């Protein structure tokens, strides 16, 4: 169910070895303070993922956020709860000032998650990301964490 919203992935990505390589890459980025990879849990199940990426320090103090949920865990507010908790950590623990997100124009569910978490729409970026095999426009959102 994520294929319309995700980059085209190699078959290797969906293997145990591919996921191990991805996990190692994410942990290496975390060690460099440029990413915070997280999982969303529902009881004892992994329900999805939440990634803070492209963390930039200095005068910018900003990052990108992305998230996904397994089909069986959508529509119950899990993404909103997880995103809200991450935003609190971004402000209180990581010292970030701003978090940005991008969604495909037709991804209204994700846009609702962002709006509920206090993000504001800041514009549309043409040909922003290569999703499902083609460059596609995205709606950009931001959340300013400090007054």
Question: What is each PLM-predicted segment?
Answer:
Residues 44, 77, 107, 133:
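Conserved G/P- and acidic residue-centered "switch" motifs that form tight phosphate/ATP-binding loops
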Residues 83, 95-102:
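A contiguous pocket-lining binding segment that forms or flanks enzyme active sites
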Residues 90-94:
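Hydrophobic pocket-lining residues that define ligand/cofactor binding sites across diverse proteins
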Residues 100-102, 120-137:
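Conserved catalytic-core motifs of GNAT/GCN5-like acyltransferases
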Residues 114, 119, 141:
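Conserved active-site tyrosine of GNAT-family acetyltransferases
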